[in-house]
Amino acid sequence: MQAAVVPARSSSWQMKDIPQPQPGPNQVLVKMHASGICYTDVHETLGHIPGEFPRILGHEPVGEIVATAPDVSSRKVGDRVGTAWVQATCGRCEWCQRGRRNFCPYQKSTGLNLQGGHAEYMLMYADSTFLIPDNVPYEQAAPIFCAGYTVWSGLRWAAPKPHERVAVHGIGGLGHLAVQYAKAAGFDTIAISHSPDKDKMIRELGADEVVRDGKGLAAAGGADIILSTTNSSKSMTDSIQALRPDGRLVIMGADAEPLAVSPMDLLIKRIRIIGSQQNDPEYLFEALDFVAKGKVKTIVETYPLAEAPKAYQRVVDGKARFRAILTM
């Protein structure tokens, strides 16, 4: 089968022919239909996330089951499925026992120590798969397994109250979904975007207002929750000034630079800084349900699998608007 392979740290993606895998215990073989390229793929390619090379990345994989292991009874051939970052865990550590599998130190993760979705076929652990609603196209479903899951988890983890105001910082691959989720959930939603050329589109996504920075957000009345999808620690720091008392900054973007925050600001306004990822399988179900009901739509660029290196470079250069999807 054809696959996009990262042969070594910081190397270019290469299309290679590799053996098609066969399902082992508790696994299903999935004929891939779409696989999203996330900016985390860049971090993995550069070796920022530990793991062995060569690698086949892709942690937004969706497709159709074409074979199952004999012990699998919950899934069948023909099912439309996807899987998220964490597929399997040890089941014995403290975090597994507490139901927080995403913290298991022995987890098996899609595209990290398990083959990812940037290939014609992929193995998935059956009990880690989610059924995709029949009315959701594969290209729309794929980004929800990371981008959508992540931003909806962040909003849920912040536990907004009905009267609270939500700001989304950074309108890109995650941010354009965060605006839609916040609005679909019924919250007054403000977007923080440095790009005036995006303003019309951002309002069409559901934003009630668009501001340029933290100062602009403060002038507009501030926010109770900021969903920060930017990759700039400096911008995150700037936005904190606009949080209202008891405000929450939810960080979903990554930057190697430290976050410079005044403890006095946190103390006086009782501000919380929350790191958030894919927090609960229930949130993935909810994130997909919004898409199935037509309340959230991903803006995607699609590329055939053979053009994976080109699509990856679009993501590296920040030119993809807003999610790059490989189709098979």
Predicted regions located by residue number:
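N-terminal Rossmann-fold NAD(P) dinucleotide-binding loop
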Residues: 175-176
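Adenosine-nucleotide cofactor-binding segment
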Residues: 165-171, 183-238
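Helix-to-beta-strand junctions that scaffold the AdoMet/dcAdoMet cofactor pocket
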Residues: 243-245
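NAD(P)H dinucleotide-binding glycine-rich loop of Rossmann-like/cofactor-binding domains
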Residues: 89-169
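C-terminal hydrophobic helical "lid"/dimerization subdomain
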Residues: 1, 237, 281-328
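Glycine-rich beta-strand-centered segment in the early N-terminal region that forms part
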Residues: 21-35, 48-94, 128, 133-139
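Short N-terminal strand-loop motif that marks the start
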Residues: 1-64, 124, 210, 327-328
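Rossmann-fold NAD(P)-binding glycine/threonine-rich loop
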Residues: 254-269, 282-287
